[in-house]
């Protein structure tokens, strides 16, 4: 070996020695660079792309906005986008890739609970950080996840209360209709127990499930119509993904109007109604913690930003830019994460987790959104909106103020003794 080769080898050995002596890890090396990498884990293909693609774009918009203001701790955010393609095991693989190969500081992603459940053991094992922006069934609390969507106490229970009330139509019979996976089944388990606690008999509750991507709702809608002949009926829909389009089309075909059998949906917002003739659906309901139609300065700013971004990036649907609840939850999440990193003066997972407690952000829903000091969930207002002919929602009911999440439902046996904060591992 020549002298130059020896010199290179010695230099490399010294550098490696210093690195090992200092305990340099992949995370620390990633921090030492000029950018902070941010993972975006949303389905851009498959049955969930109808809902998730726009969340990827929301993160990218927020990153552009943060970078334009100087970044985080003087460093630009660098997005790393992957497509888990509505394939639940692939979510876990992509998460591992983001954390071990791409060395991201945080991941924003998932929609379905089955995708989140796939990701959970990976972020826990590798001590990663996931911000999850969609309503879910609860019954989970991880130190490595911040849940910026709603727990059942912030969506499902208030929606049922509203439909049971005299003002909401006084429903006596209930069809619990969902996609066949953990979120609908667990939510409906909670709702069945809740309805029974309110005196509703088993014979007045019907549960139905369809697979992801299901497209033929003729028989199910006919069954709902028949069931509703037994008394004032409401449908609670936890159908997810592109199946919502044929379901709502079939409601229209069958002439099942909201005044006869109102449907309240937990996974249908402005984006999902884009491909549907909404005129037959006028008056049907959705329960969320945000609607595009809310009038307040923070939402005016949010919707204008999104419209400008969609136009500039030539996004699909830019001619009719829409915002929805999971977009708002995503936007709150990345801004709170930024604030927490700056408070912690580090992207270290444990330091950021500690700094997230009690973070606040002026949310497009019109409230100052707060991350609970203990349970990793946002305090959220609840709104029920009626579908309008233009595909927007008219808010007909809301909670007096923000509602605290209860991750462990009091309507599931054994939950009373579970702590309202993640168990340290």
Feature locations, PLM:
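Periplasmic-binding protein-like
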Residues: 98-110, 131-133, 173-178, 230-241, ...
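Signal peptide-proximal N-terminal region
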Residues: 31-33, 57-79, 169, 197-202
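Extracellular/periplasmic periplasmic-binding protein-like sensory domains
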Residues: 251-331, 342-345, 399-424
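Beta-alpha junction/loop-to-helix N-cap segments that form part of ligand/metal-binding clefts
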Residues: 50-57, 69-140, 148, 209-218, ...
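Extracellular/periplasmic Venus flytrap/periplasmic-binding protein
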Residues: 90-93, 137, 144-254, 297, ...
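Extracytoplasmic "Venus flytrap"
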Residues: 39-58, 82-89, 111-114, 179-185, ...
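Short, low-complexity disordered leader/linker segments with a strong preference
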Residues: 1-37, 68, 418-425
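Solvent-exposed, acidic/polar segments of extracytosolic/periplasmic ligand-binding ectodomains
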Residues: 36, 360-425
């Amino acid at each position: 070996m020549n002298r130059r080769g020896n010199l290179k080898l010695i230099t490399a050995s010294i550098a490696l020695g210093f690195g090992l002596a200092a305990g340099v890890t992949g995370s620390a090396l990633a921090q030492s660079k000029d950018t902070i990498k941010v993972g975006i884990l949303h389905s851009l293909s498959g049955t969930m792309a109808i809902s998730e693609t726009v969340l990827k774009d929301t993160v990218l918009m927020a990153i552009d906005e943060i970078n334009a203001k100087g970044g985080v701790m003087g460093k630009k955010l660098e997005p790393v986008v992957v497509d888990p393609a509505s394939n639940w095991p692939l979510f876990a693989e992509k998460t591992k890739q983001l954390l071990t190969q791409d060395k991201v500081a945080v991941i924003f992603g998932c929609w379905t609970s089955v995708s989140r459940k796939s990701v959970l053991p990976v972020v826990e094992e590798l001590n990663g950080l996931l911000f999850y922006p969609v309503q879910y069934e609860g019954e989970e609390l991880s130190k490595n996840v911040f849940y910026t969507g709603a727990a059942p106490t912030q969506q499902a229970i208030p929606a049922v209360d509203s439909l049971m009330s005299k003002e909401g139509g006084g429903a006596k019979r209930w069809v619990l209709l969902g996609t066949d996976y953990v979120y609908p089944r667990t939510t409906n388990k909670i709702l069945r127990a809740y309805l029974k606690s309110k005196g509703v008999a088993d014979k007045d509750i019907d549960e139905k499930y369809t697979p992801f991507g299901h497209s033929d709702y003729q028989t199910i809608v006919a069954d709902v119509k028949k069931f509703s002949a037994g008394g004032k009926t409401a449908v609670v829909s936890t159908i997810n993904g592109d199946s919502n389009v044929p379901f709502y089309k079939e409601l229209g075909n069958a002439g099942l109007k909201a005044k006869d059998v109102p449907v309240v949906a937990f996974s249908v917002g402005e984006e999902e109604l884009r491909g549907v003739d909404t005129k037959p659906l006028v008056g049907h309901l959705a329960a969320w913690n945000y609607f595009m139609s809310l009038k307040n300065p923070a939402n005016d700013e949010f919707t204008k930003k999104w419209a400008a971004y969609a136009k500039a990036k030539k996004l699909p649907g830019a001619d009719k830019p829409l915002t929805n609840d999971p977009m708002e939850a995503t936007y709150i999440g990345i801004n709170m994460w930024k604030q927490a990193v700056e408070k912690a003066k580090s992207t270290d997972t444990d330091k950021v987790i500690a700094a997230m407690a009690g973070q606040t952000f002026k949310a497009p829903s019109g409230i100052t959104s707060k991350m609970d000091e203990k349970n990793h969930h946002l305090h959220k207002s609840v709104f029920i909106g009626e579908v309008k002919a233009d595909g927007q929602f008219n808010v007909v009911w809301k909670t007096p103020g923000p509602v605290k999440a209860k991750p462990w439902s009091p309507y599931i046996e054994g939950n009373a003794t579970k702590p309202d904060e993640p168990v340290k591992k």
